[in-house]
Amino acid sequence: MCKVNWMLVEDSDFDCPVPGLPLSRQVFVNDALAAGYALAVRPRSGQSVIQTSSDGLVAGDIHIRGSDKVAVRAYWVQPAGKGPFPTVLVVQEIFGVHEYIRDTCRRLARQGYQAIAPNLFQRHGDPMGMPTVQELMSDIVAEVADAQVLSDLDACAAWAAANGGDPGRLGLTGFCWGGRIAWLYAAYNPRLKAAVAWYGRLKGSSSPMTPHHPVDLARALQAPVLGLYGGKDPSIPVEDVEAMRGGLAEAGKRAEIVVYPEAGHAFHADYRPSFRAVDASNGWGRMLEWFRANGL
């Protein structure tokens, strides 16, 4: 059963063509800008305001071989001591695996999880090196295929199971771009116990790179998903949330969608002006509850 709390918000239209882009990529960039990335503040380093100590944790940068034999870089952290630990895959925003994402992994490790954040854009460039969000979207994000992302996440899950993670307790959380991936992975991997999607896009145009969106996959979900959204996020209109809720309810899927009335997009991102401490803290608590209620 799906539950949702929401309030009406006004949608915003963006028309930001990128000269010279092939149509499929142009559609993707327009969709992405309309999904709130145009409002994103490009971080200098993604330096998290919240600084989580690594005392009592083991952490480091690792490489995980993908299905195409590319060694994908990832940040890994878990409690010191003997496992196996439940694993949470952490899926980045469009800005990559910067310090905020790493700190989020450490926060999870302090709760007893093994956390892994793979660099899912690695094959296409460094997000932090792009001069504008628009160029980041067209030159990197538009080149990333959902199929490759899902395959890379599978590789991370396999690595985790062989390196201190409990193969029977796998979860995932994602932010912004990664929030959409959270819904997709819950429809893709039957071994996933639970997922939490933070303000992930629910609708979009179909393309070879992104053939399906969460609203298309409500019936296909194989794991319970918690969606956390901002009531003042101009990028994800209430109609999209309602459509997702309706699809989940019709399919009889176990899911919950929470909308924070005064929050905008990226309300958990503590390095950005959009950060809302109270809502972020509440969402974090709900996420941990969701994981534990579903065997993680």
Stretches with model-predicted labels:
Residues D154-A220:
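Primarily recognizes the serine-hydrolase "nucleophile elbow" in alpha/beta-hydrolase
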Residues Q47-G81:
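N-terminal cap/lid segment of alpha/beta-hydrolase-fold proteins
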Residues E99-R123:
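Short amphipathic alpha-helix adjacent to the substrate-entry channel of hydrolases
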Residues M1-L23:
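N-terminal secretory signal peptides
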Residues A249-L296:
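C-terminal catalytic histidine-bearing segment of alpha/beta-hydrolase fold enzymes
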Residues L221, G227-Y229:
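Short beta-strand/loop motif that positions the catalytic acidic residue
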Residues L136-N163:
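Alpha/beta-hydrolase active-site loop
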Residues P84-E93:
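Short beta-strand element of the alpha/beta-hydrolase
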